Design a protein with these regions (language model features):
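Short capping loops/turns at secondary-structure boundaries
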Residues: 70, 96-97, 114-118
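Stable alpha-helical structural segments in soluble proteins, enriched in small hydrophobic residues
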Residues: 79, 102-108
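Short, flexible micro-motifs
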Residues: 13-16, 103, 112
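Gly/Ala-rich beta-loop-alpha elbow adjacent to hydrolase catalytic centers
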Residues: 92-100, 104
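Alpha/beta catalytic cores of group-transfer enzymes, especially the acyltransferase/condensing modules
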Residues: 108-125
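Helix-rich "cap/lid" substructures immediately adjacent to catalytic or cofactor-binding pockets
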Residues: 2-95
């Protein structure tokens, strides 16, 4: 029998110097979702999530603005959710507040990735 799991998605947070390289360290770069976010951002001439997370040095002027920090937090949370061992855990509920509400919608599969692109969810890119 699988353990039941309630996932609480993070609301506002920070992507600070200690988080730099998080996707590479914990998720081998982040997978398909990160690649899709990278392509989306590149299309707008914005630094990609992979570039931001893989930077040699943390730069407050680069990493802290909302258009970068919000998506870094979002990308890390999506990668964390995707890494849950579904053989061991059954996700029975997903919740969040503030930005975590958007994350919860994504993690729960309420809207698909492509559908989110036209909703304003990524307008901060």
């Amino acid at each position: 029998m699988k353990e039941k799991l309630l996932v609480v998605c993070p609301g506002r947070g920070t992507y600070g110097a200690t988080e730099l390289g998080y996707l590479k360290r914990h998720h081998n770069g982040g997978g398909d979702n990160i690649a899709r976010l990278d392509a989306y951002r590149a299309g707008f001439g914005q630094p990609t999530i992979s570039e931001l997370d893989g930077a040699e040095k943390y730069s407050p002027s680069l990493h802290m603005p909302g258009n970068n920090a919000s998506l870094l937090i979002y990308a890390c949370a999506l990668a964390d959710f995707a890494a849950i061992d579904r053989e061991r855990f059954e996700v029975v509920a997903v919740t969040g507040n503030s930005m975590g509400w958007y994350l919860a919608l994504s993690c729960a599969g309420v809207v698909g990735f492509d559908a989110r692109l036209g909703t304003g969810l990524f307008d901060f890119c």
